Each structure stands twice: as C-alpha cells, then as structure tokens.
Amino acid sequence: MASSATMLSSVATAARAAPAQASMVAPFVGLKSASAFPVTQKPATGLSTLPSNGGRVQCMKVWPIVGLKKFETLSYLPTLSVESLLKQIEYLIRNGWVPCLEFSLEGFVSRDNNKSPGYYDGRYWTMWKLPMFGCTDAAQVVKEAAECKKEYPAAFIRVIGFDNVRQVQCVSFIVEKPE
C-alpha cells in the first residue's frame, strides 16, 4: 500500500512539473517585420567606380598550351639558378623534411589503359637512390641531382621534401628538364 502511494505521488509531481516547463518557452509569434531592420542603399553610380586592372588584361595569360609542360609550384618560373635551388633545398631541410630525388623520362600524366591512377600513368616517378635521411647539406642534394642528370640526360628530375613523421610529401619542384 505504501509503495502505491509513493508511485501516485511521484506521478502527481511529474504532472505538475510538465506544465511549468512548457510555459518557460515563449510562443512563436512570427518573423519580425522588415521595418525593424534598417536598410542602407548604396548610391547608384556608373561603371567607372568598379575595380579594374586597366590595360593589364593582355598580361594575364598563364602558360602556352603547346611545347611547355608545367608541373609543380615553381614550374611557372624560369629555370632555377644554382643559388635559388640551394635556397629551396635549404628551406625544406630547415623544416625537417627529408630530401628525395625522383626522375621521369616522360614527365606527363596519361591514363591510356585504365581510369584509376596507377604506377605507370606518369603520376608516380622513379626514385633516384634512397631518400636522403639525415641530410643537412643542400649541396649534397644538388650533387645527387647532377649525378642523376648525367645518368639520365633526357629525364625530368624533381626534388621532394618528405615529412617522415606525418608521412606526406610537403614540397616538390623540378630541378632539371631535358633539353
């Protein structure tokens, strides 16, 4: 008997609590009128106030479509000088990335036999020797690139900065192109 009285009192308490919680939320009365928000209108002006690059439109061509292949980030620049190349390699060494040399005789991505990427479609280049773990001298990387160029004179050669902690390629740029 006592247990049924306790159950009845808890149901009554729950019934009293429900209406109190429902009345705490204000009812939806609709959206506010547009007059409550001030609207600022820009003065109507001519096209002379629009931003313009002037006569430089002729200079916006990015690259010719015939005879000049483009690859990684720095391929739109002229061929790197030895000093510029050393600075780029020193940058990747300073960031703790492992220099690695790769080469490709074609230097072009083509998917002739399959639509999914694979080893022989040009996306993956052949590694020159092993990655240069522990390398702290940019001149050593340039020397290896020259050795690769001597072995494969008709190849594209690139340097990759590989982060061995995150297991990702962080930087990649062409150092040698075939003549």
Curated annotation (Swiss-Prot):
Annotated localization: Plastid, Chloroplast
Keywords tagged on the record: Calvin cycle, Carbon dioxide fixation, Chloroplast, Photorespiration, Photosynthesis, Plastid, Transit peptide
This protein's name: Ribulose bisphosphate carboxylase small subunit, chloroplastic 3
Any single GO CC term annotated in Swiss-Prot or TrEMBL for this entry: chloroplast
Family of the protein in this entry: Belongs to the RuBisCO small chain family.
A biological process term (GO) from this entry: photorespiration
Annotated Pfam families: RbcS, RuBisCO_small
A GO molecular-function descriptor: ribulose-bisphosphate carboxylase activity
